Amino acid sequence: MDSYIALTLFGCFFVLVFIGVPISFSIGIATVASMLLMFPWDIAAITVSQRLANGLDNFALLAIPFFIFAGTLMNSGGIAIRLINLAQVMVGRVPGSLGHVNVLANMMFGSISGSAVAAAAAVGGTLNPIQTKEGYDPAFSTAVNVSSCITGLLIPPSNVLIVFSLTAGGVSVASLFMAGYLPGILMGLAVMIVCGIIAKRRGYPLSEKATFAQACKAFLDALPSLLLVFIVMGGILGGIFTAAEASAIAVVYTFILSVLIYREVKWRDLPKLILESVVTTSIVLLLIGFSVGMSWAMTNADIPYMISDALMGISDNPLVILLLINIVLLIVGIFMDMTPA
């Protein structure tokens, strides 16, 4: 019976994704379909509703809408262009300089906003036209932007790490944030190395060398934005506030920068930005809620034990098992976003 439930759950999910049904609804429908094999329809409906509500009944999830709103404010508040100017000063004379600027700006913006999507939109939207004008292949520019924006998923604060903390049974958010720095930086450096090799082969131009005065100006302009990282991470690691409280502080700080200091965001723009954040938050939280329900259905059908037995049948070496899990995540990540994966 368990094998039929597993086949129904995953088969229904992949068929729905393949025909274009949104992932959150694909997860929800597949979960309901599998539960109908375990319970009568009325109990299945009640159970799915309860699991969805229970999955969202967590104080730590408050961090997600706040960080999303902070990222939306940053995207429109002139923070991205200041980080781009700082990155250009840092790597302006390196082959493929605008590509390296893209990577560094994505790393800095992602570490501030906690969102890869916000970083890709803000940095790519600003740099791609400039790169095209300088003779960069648009496909190359897009590839660099997409490859580097995902560093924001690792370099704290990161919404994905918060979601993982909840789904993994309460792993410390502060520990996950600290663990995210090294792989995020290494990933960014790897993209920069490949970018430099390709740029040198294609003969992409260098940027003009910045004067000391220009470098100081770029640093001072970007400093208020960069301070947000130290405020958020320093507060979390120092035990001053939790991740949820830090996200609220990030919104207040970003609001002051974007609306009151830089004045790039007008008061009349706020309702639109709030609505954008609400839509994005709704999508993420719906994914989390349905994913919790799907996890419960899998556990109730002993699917995790089946997967565990299959993995242990291949090898009992922890490194091999981790490698297999990463291969599975790589394949699954082709079809769906990081949060439901």
Q: What residue ranges belong to the model's regions?
A:
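Alpha-helical transmembrane segments of multi-pass membrane transport proteins
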Residues: 1-341
